[in-house]
UniProtKB/Swiss-Prot annotation:
One of its GO terms (molecular function) is ferrous iron binding. Oligomer of 24 subunits. There are two types of subunits: L (light) chain and H (heavy) chain. The major chain can be light or heavy, depending on the species and tissue type. The functional molecule forms a roughly spherical shell with a diameter of 12 nm and contains a central cavity into which the insoluble mineral iron core is deposited. SUPFAM superfamilies: Ferritin-like. Residues 82-235 form the Ferritin-like diiron domain. This is Ferritin, chloroplastic. It catalyses: 4 Fe(2+) + O2 + 4 H(+) = 4 Fe(3+) + 2 H2O. Residues 49-81 are annotated as: Extension peptide (EP). Its EC number is 1.16.3.1. GO terms for biological process: intracellular iron ion homeostasis; iron ion transport. Fe cation 2 binds at E134, E183, Q217. One of its GO terms (cellular component) is chloroplast. CDD domains: Euk_Ferritin. Pfam families: Ferritin. It comes from Phaseolus vulgaris.
Length: 254
């Protein structure tokens, strides 16, 4: 016996908010009422009006119209500067001066130990390399200042002594203790710059100081501390010459 063909409407989707199997036009949007739930006193419902139906979340051509994003047109005004406080700019210029002054002190120490009547070539090499490293730090800060749209302002460098003899300690120990105090001072100044960055909510400056300077600084302090301890053990006699030879062949700048 042949069965009459049944008339079945094509499946066109169903609503998640109606009963299961309820036929719905596929061109209509799906209801989001199944997300309207409460947990305790908190409403976790999602309104259909909050769902970006177009998929557009970021509209760059509209957002770049903000006044703070406008490109300056006045002369002598940085085009790159953004979220860079005047206090941060001043702190960087001051740190540049700190690094140059430290370099100047180390260069004077190099000249002293390189004399023909002192002739401690290892100390001379160590302090010359330290001077060059501090100068490189100053140049790195200058480059960062320009990167952020600041203006480099160089301050005067103070005169430094040229004699480092010390009756009780000897010139070698006295000079190395001076270097240790200098590295601690530079570290203190760098931490001050980091505090300025935190106070002005400048994470980029804070990251720059942390990644480029602070870790290296504590390592330098540790190394020179060891040099001071060793020089205290060897005294002012023949041991200084042996220590100088170790610096000449193995030592590196702070």
């Amino acid at each position: 016996m042949a069965l009459a063909p049944s008339k079945v409407s094509p499946f066109s989707g169903f609503s998640l908010s109606d009963g299961v199997g309820a036929v719905r036009n596929p061109t209509c949007s799906v209801s989001l009422s199944f997300l309207n739930k409460k947990v305790g006193s908190r409403n976790l419902g999602v309104s259909a009006s909050t769902v970006p139906l177009t998929g557009v979340i970021f509209e760059p051509f509209e957002e770049v119209k903000k006044e703070e994003l406008a490109v300056p047109t006045a002369g002598q005004v940085s085009l790159a500067r953004q979220y860079y406080a005047d206090e941060c700019e001043s702190a960087i210029n001051e740190q540049i001066n700190v690094e140059y002054n430290a370099s100047y002190v180390y260069h004077s120490l190099f000249a002293y130990f390189d004399r023909d009547n002192v002739a401690l070539k290892g100390f001379a090499r160590f302090f010359k390399e330290s001077s060059e490293e501090e100068r490189e730090h100053a140049e790195k800060l200058m480059k960062y200042q320009n990167t952020r749209g600041g203006r480099v302002v160089l301050h005067p460098i103070k005169n430094v002594p040229s004699e480092f003899e010390h009756v009780e300690k000897g010139d070698a120990l006295y000079a190395m203790e001076l270097a240790l105090s200098l590295e601690k001072l530079v570290n203190e100044k760098l931490r001050s710059v980091h505090s300025v960055a935190d106070r002005n909510k400048d994470p980029q400056l804070a990251d720059f100081i942390e990644s480029e300077f602070l870790s290296e600084q504590v390592e330098a302090i540790k190394k020179i501390s060891e040099y001071v301890a060793q020089l205290r053990m060897v005294g002012k006699g023949h041991g200084v010459w042996h220590f100088d030879q170790s610096l000449l062949h193995d030592g590196h700048a702070a």
